């Protein structure tokens, strides 16, 4: 069984992100990049499916600039067999739908039994690509899954989707799309052997012309990015407890409009 895992390279959560000079994108200078954490759950689950079945192939796929290969190498170090890197200036100003079209085209070429995503990328929190890919392919889709089990015949996958108070259980015919939620598993750390072996594994570079081109322009564009305003300093209320309590209530009601 072949499993494709779509991943995205995002800024490390510990990185101080600044807005670029054009006001429409972040300044990438000095940023540390990582695999989006939710995508790591998807990679881990793909590896577990392969290990449980005793055979198969796990392919990591990502769209982005040259540095995206670092994220793909991380997936190869975890245990993915090979990777596909979608890299073309035609996708530089793309939105989620353009990304979904490109990924769907690769998925059609690869013809996997299962396509896994993280529930959302932590840089934009859009969470749209998995569902868009499923719609473009005409495949069933389950989002935010907390458990999964592929049947022995490789014909269906049973997934548990988190809802308030429990799990919704679905049986999806394969091929299908699913997006991973935190709690699905605990992603493994790459071993030294895995890190060294990743250097020898294939990363296939794909251009827009290889999959039919980026024929439709992005439907969504960023107008402006703004930094959050500085947080106002706290206020210490002095005095006797009774008077301080009255002042606190007044401040919450009249100044903060909190009560």
For every predicted segment, state its role.
Residues 1-259:
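N-terminal glycine-rich FAD/FM-binding segment characteristic of electron-transfer flavoproteins
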